Amino acid sequence: GGKSNTVESKVQETAAEETMTVDKDKKEIVMLCEVNGTYFTEPTRHGIVYKGGSNGEKAVLRGLADEKEFYQALLDIGAKAGDNLTAADMKAGPDNGKSVEGDKLDVFVKWDGQDEIPFRDIIKCTEDYTMDLRFGGNIESAKENNTGCVLCLDSCATGIVSDAAWPTGTTQNDIAKFYGDKDVLPEDGTQVTVVFRLAK
């Protein structure tokens, strides 16, 4: 009967809401993620990737919410996308990369027993730097490639959010290597909460 369907769709909606919540007044998005301990020792350019995407197992944090819904959530809190990078930009050499544009975001991580800390604090890098996360946008590329990429650690033409501090070409030219910091993050598989705020 029709009833059971309604119940099921309600259950699914609740599940979706629990993995990502949006507060338009506070201009913030909260996403549940899991630590992937592989990247304590292996470098990756992926900060957060939705577990259902093709790159779902390639990130420091496995995102539990869909990157395309995350894109919409950013629009909903009033963020403007940069949409300035193309696939061609991703083939940059060590000295001609482009930086992602778009509204600046302040991103924090917290978990049981740990208050909010900046996302930068969970990343170990071979170079010292200041993170500059931007709403790159890239929804067309996200739909086409289905990588699941939520947050990239260098400027990216597919990830919804990426870091303007590092131009395209950073990782493939070995300018910087990024890891999850095992001295900061909890153990592999631990659930953490990531908070994205539109910077003032």
Name the predicted role of every residue range.
Residues 1-15:
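Bacterial Sec-dependent signal peptides at the C-terminal "C-region" and cleavage site
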